[in-house]
Amino acid sequence: GSPNFSVRLEKNVMTKGTLRKLIEECFSGDSDVALFYFSGHGHIDSVGGYLVTPDFSEYDYGVTLQDVLSIANNSKCKEKFIILDSCYSGFMGRINSKGQSTAVINEGVTILTASRSTESSVEMNGHGVFTALLLEALSGGAADILGHITPGGIYAYIDKALGPWEQRPVFKTNVTCFTSLRKVIPQVDIGVIRRICDYFCEENKELEMDPSFEPTNSPDVNHEVIKPYADPKNTSVFSELQKLEGIGLVIPVGEEHMYFAAMNSKSCKLTSLGKQYWRLVHNNLI
């Protein structure tokens, strides 16, 4: 995959002042993307939520979630991401006013938290469960067909992995489109996907196949063969069609497998997702 962001790792941040300074520095400047990730203790009271630091005391637990959000909201960076693996972190993005809780997230801000405002965050084998799933998602588990990993994809990956009775991740955003946080090698080369319009002249058109598409249907292979025999041009197309089937863009028509669709002179067609990518290719968007 692609290299990560320019990363600054800070371990054992001991004071509230130091953590506040690091958050300010993270969202300073005018870069395209700034991402703040915190894994540690969280606290909530009648006033709001906190990222707890070791120097905490009663009524002064650490950096408030409202301060973190205000810093991100006021940042000149184009896209601001806040990812929190701490107890009660789902309170992030809300303020209490006269007994009511209101969401206040400026444009360009995205928040992903390990749990809801009333939940603790589970730890297992030295890792927060949320962080372990986050790492899996960034390693490719949350990648789309093109290999892009977006905040929405990460949330969907983590959401599916956690059961209804476990801690629930929270996703809040105010953006017009998702930014890719990382790119990994896609399951199918982009060149193959871009040829989808070569094989299907229209998104609802089926591609007729015959035995010449199956590479093993050749007199050179010691088994029963059917005319027309394997044709190199068609077998090359068939190979790519099978790859597109593997990522859910193509399905055989009238048969369970692409092999039998070819050998029985059936056809294949685009799935609903395949039609979406057909339109993207047709309109030169990928």
Located regions from the model:
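Short amphipathic alpha-helical interaction segments
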Residues: 230-252, 265
